[in-house]
């Protein structure tokens, strides 16, 4: 018999995470590495685990993630988004608390492009009066 698994796709900035929830004991594996080795910062690990802690499903599922693009912060946000969507497929009754925490909303903020004549997106060259 096929194993039950729930899929979810999360995005943040330039990162895209494909998340699979499989019934298990709470391990999180990102790109075939344990979460502790992939994310060095504790804050990023906390961000990834937020939906599981909020819904009290940390010990019910193993989380298998493929993530690419962007930096570590964007990837952590994308994984959080993907886990939240996968949890919804597992149990629709979790929607109100996930929605209230803001985990189901795709963060629309993207990097603003650099404009010509300026040093960065908004930073102008230093002004000299004389």
Swiss-Prot record:
GO terms for biological process: translation. It comes from the Bacteria. This is Small ribosomal subunit protein uS9. NCBIfam families: PRK00132.1. Keywords: Ribonucleoprotein, Ribosomal protein. The gene is rpsI. Signal peptide: none annotated. One of its GO terms (molecular function) is structural constituent of ribosome. Pfam families: Ribosomal_S9. GO terms for cellular component: cytosolic small ribosomal subunit. Belongs to the universal ribosomal protein uS9 family. It comes from Clostridium perfringens (strain 13 / Type A). The keyword Ribonucleoprotein applies.
């Amino acid at each position: 018999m096929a194993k039950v698994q729930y899929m979810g796709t999360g995005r943040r900035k330039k990162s895209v995470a494909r998340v699979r929830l499989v019934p298990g004991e709470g391990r999180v594996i990102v790109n075939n590495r344990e979460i502790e080795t992939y994310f060095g910062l504790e804050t990023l690990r906390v961000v990834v685990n937020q939906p599981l802690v909020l819904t009290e499903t940390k010990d019910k599922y193993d989380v298998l993630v493929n993530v690419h693009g962007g930096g570590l912060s964007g990837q952590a946000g994308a994984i959080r988004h993907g886990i939240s969507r996968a949890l919804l497929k597992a149990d629709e009754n979790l929607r109100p608390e996930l929605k209230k925490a803001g985990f189901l909303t795709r963060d629309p903020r993207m990097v603003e492009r650099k404009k010509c004549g300026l040093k960065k997106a908004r930073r102008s060259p230093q002004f000299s009066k004389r």
